[in-house]
Amino acid sequence: MASEYLEHKLALLPGLPGCYLMKNINSQIIYVGKAKNLKNRVRSYFKSSHTGKTAQLVSEIVDFETIITSTDKEAFLLEITLIQKHQPYFNIKLKRGTGYPYIKITNERDPQLLLVSDIRKDGAYYFGPYPNVYAAEETMHFLQKVYPLRRCPGHQGRPCLYYHMGQCLGACFKEVPEAEYDQQIRKIKSFLNGNVGHAKKDLTQRMEKAAADMAYERAGDLRDQIRYIEATVEKQKIISNDSTPRDIFNFYLDKGWLSIQVFFIRQARLMKREKRLFPVVNSAEEELASFIVQFYQRKNTVLPREILVPASIDHDVIEELLKVPVRTPQRGTKRDLLEMAGKNAKLVLEEKFRLLELDEGKTTGAMKEITDALGIAPGHKIEAFDHSHIQGADLVSAMVVFVDGQPNKKLYRKYKLQTVDHADETASTLEVIRRRYGRLLKEHAPMPDLILMDGGDIQMNAVKEVLEDEFDLHIPVAGMVKNDHHKTADLLFGPDDHHVHLDPKSQGFYLVQRIQDEVHRFAISFHRQVHTKHSLSSRLDRIPGVGPKTRNKLLRKFGSTKKISEASMAEIRELGISEAVARTIHVTLAAETAEIKNPRTPTSL
């Protein structure tokens, strides 16, 4: 059964081909699919009965997003790109990182391939942006195997491990001719610009030769590299055979709001997109021209070889400022892509307008219901607190902020408790309230209109003690009460901590429920991070030869003991760790993992 919010969105779906992205309660994309008719396909998830994995997927969907395309074929190709980009749980279980990194070929005598997020004017060659770290790493590792440059610090007097693996040209122990580097770099650039035919042909010839020489392991590696090209490059093209890196901008204007869509075309495929919505003062054309120029003035943004815009945009001004050709395609695939960006801009804006009324009830309207029920002045900002610990260990507190009924995650705060060493609601509350509002007073920052505590009268009285007696602040404080089923029930408020009832079907009740769930989630999540870090540190500290510096290196690189135990000796030694210590780490963690998987049965007396 779809929620009221989803029912509104389902009613807005177009009967066009495209892709849909299902999201869970944390706004994570958990599934990407395609459809000839988005309206029929997406509605089928919520209007039909399901079993197994589909039923599990539907139970986790709280929101969705769509991208319309011109044809079903485009939808199919775009689906592949989106799955590769987002790594959704219900498509592929592998998830590795976020962000938009670039592959860099350094400008050195012995150049190397690197993954970077900072773009500098250092004469290096940058290719990207990639949709995520996973996609960039896969591409870079492929290039390091097929077209190696330097993969070691260099000049160490002996061949490095990567040289023996065929992934380094040998700057570690000899002088590599510049011509050899130049040849490799030309091949790398050609591949990154979408010209993969030569690489595939070369790999096929090498695979056949290795098989003929009965070097079957090497032939298998080469076969996997060919499959990488087929799976992640060739199948991800979106119609065009033109590999020119280009960005496409289009817009839709209505009721004083401008919707902008940006498509990033790299290696002849839609690498990623950005969408923006904001109210405008000038004409849409002027606003878009200004937006484009500012867009490329941001840090770590590489200019494409070509920018496509609608005909109404002033090409000359943008070209002059950015020194990049700006064109309006008249026919063919490029015109289709420009129109696709415009259609998506329109769809996003129309959806916003139709959801505004519903959103208003859930945000500012819900906030007013709460303040009216408490009998306090109307306000905008709520701050809520919760504590978390395990048997009095690793005590933490967390605060979430909701403004006009919406979470503002930039204002969230985490607190490691410093004066409390055991489970004590009063002491924990006193410390976190002193730290939070003492800081706001010192910085002359605005105070919230309401404070909510995920607890009863003990926490509320502690808050009032600090605010009123120590800081002379008079901020309304209420406690969020749960019923026997651990669900939001009422609010506690006033000098006598009386129960304030909220209609369970009201938006105000839903907002309190959201705040209570969110602050609990945030506190639990932070506690797990702290507890896991302490647990990891203690496990590593017990290994002979591992001191604080080595421990921190390992945690920064791998993040968990599981990943450390799965790492090769070479990967551990890359951190500057000696072979003996690396071997001890590897053996110790492997033994611990084996003990967890196959615990010994106690012997009977």
From Swiss-Prot:
Entry's localization field: Cytoplasm
Domain GIY-YIG: 15-92
Any Gene Ontology biological process: nucleotide-excision repair
Positions of the UVR domain: 197-232
Entry keyword DNA damage: yes
GO-annotated molecular function: DNA binding; excinuclease ABC activity
Pfam families given in the database record: GIY-YIG, HHH_5, UVR, UvrC_RNaseH, UvrC_RNaseH_dom
Keyword DNA damage annotated: yes
Family named by the database record: Belongs to the UvrC family.
Protein's job: The UvrABC repair system catalyzes the recognition and processing of DNA lesions. UvrC both incises the 5' and 3' sides of the lesion. The N-terminal half is responsible for the 3' incision and the C-terminal half is responsible for the 5' incision.
Subunit and partners: Interacts with UvrB in an incision complex.
Protein name: UvrABC system protein C
Lineage, uppermost ranks: Bacteria, Bacillati, Bacillota, Bacilli, Lactobacillales
